[in-house]
Regions:
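Loop-to-transmembrane helix entry
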Residues: 37-40, 120, 126-148, 166-175, ...
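C-terminal transmembrane helical hairpin of 12-TM major facilitator-type secondary transporters
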Residues: 171-234
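A late C-terminal transmembrane helix in Major Facilitator Superfamily
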Residues: 243-276
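Intracellular juxtamembrane helix-capping segments at the cytosolic ends
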Residues: 232-246
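Intracellular loop-helix junctions on the cytosolic face of multi-pass helical membrane proteins
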Residues: 1-132, 157-165, 302-311
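Hydrophobic/aromatic residues within the transmembrane alpha-helices of Major Facilitator Superfamily
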Residues: 107-111, 144, 182, 189, ...
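Transmembrane alpha-helices of Major Facilitator/SLC transporters
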Residues: 57-61, 134-163, 175-187, 265
Length: 311
């Protein structure tokens, strides 16, 4: 510890104190931390292995209930008239146009959703009183909601389909954008009521004033709840849409384009922290709300065309 910079040493002492440790002997405290950290890593891998084994058991037990794989049909040489070729080419173009339209919308969803690793993480660090919640718990919120909410949402979709009121995939994506926008609208209104300045200005306030104005942990829980529901409306259903719309000869390429859209959305993530540090926080969240709302509007404007193409 003698070689550590004074600021780094002060941060280390603050972390140890907040965790209930003793700063009398930093060597002992650091050793205890490393021991707990290493044990946690081992338990996480054990949990992963156990989950994979359970999945494998479920697969073998349920194998008889799976649909019979389609048999491969021998390739045949088929000749088409010029009119048939033109019609097929036109259909492929329509399908690709529809695919690129949806991918364009999805870029802005991932740009907003993946702020959970950028501006939302900074918000949790700077504006949320997370002393009662361990960091690893925050990391588990989204996966927990995915596991808990997926059966519920799928049951709702299945129930609507049985009643003849099935919602098309393009409409589900539009609804997902609305739900994502709701998460950011909630954050914007909350931040406006609290009167939060930009992150840079907030850090200049006295520590006591910062602590007094920090948000409760439930704010992040509510935000991640809405964002996870939006993810369930868009991510798996969007990939399913790609499989339905993509020409069979280009299925693999089109699924790769879905991942490319995700990558493009991630390339825009830097904009979030830029606004977060420079603008009042409510303005930052309002931008994401508008992005989601506009994307939803564009998607709804294309719904009938997309539904026609998928049929």
């Amino acid at each position: 510890t003698a070689t550590k910079a004074p600021e780094a040493l002060a941060n280390l002492q603050q972390l140890i104190t907040s965790a209930g440790g003793s700063i009398a002997d930093l060597t002992v405290s650091c050793a205890q931390y490393l021991q707990i950290f290493n044990e946690g890593i081992h338990y996480s891998f054990i949990a992963s292995v156990a989950a994979m084994l359970i999945s494998l058991i479920i697969f073998f037990v349920s194998q008889k209930t799976f649909p019979t794989p389609a048999k491969k049909i021998a390739a045949q040489n088929v000749s088409y008239t010029p009119e048939e070729k033109a019609a097929m080419a036109k259909e492929i173009k329509q399908r690709m146009y529809a695919l690129f339209a949806v991918l364009g919308i999805v870029i802005f969803f991932w740009f907003s959703f993946h702020q959970n690793g950028m501006s939302l993480s900074f918000f949790a660090r700077d504006f949320v009183d997370s002393s009662a919640v361990a960091p690893e718990v925050w990391q588990a919120i989204n996966p927990f909601f995915v596991i808990a909410l997926t059966p519920v949402i799928m049951a709702i979709f299945g129930g609507l389909a049985k009643r003849g009121k099935e919602i098309s995939t393009p409409r589900k994506i539009a609804i997902g954008m609305f739900i994502a926008g709701t998460a950011f609208l909630f954050l914007a209104v909350f931040s406006l009521i609290k009167g939060y300045p930009s992150a840079n200005d907030f850090k200049l306030l006295p520590i006591a004033e910062q602590m007094a104005n920090k948000a409760h942990w439930w704010v992040l829980i509510a935000t991640y709840f809405f964002l996870t529901v939006a993810e369930l409306f868009i991510s798996p259903l969007g990939l399913s849409f790609v499989s339905k719309v993509a020409p069979k000869s280009m299925l693999g390429l089109c699924q790769g384009l879905w991942l490319a859209a995700t990558a493009l959305g991630n390339l825009l993530l830097w904009i979030g922290p830029l606004m977060y540090n420079a603008w009042p926080i409510w303005q930052c969240w309002t931008v994401f709300f508008i992005v989601c709302l506009v994307s939803m509007g564009v998607m709804l404007g294309m719904v009938k065309w997309l539904e026609r193409v998928t049929k």
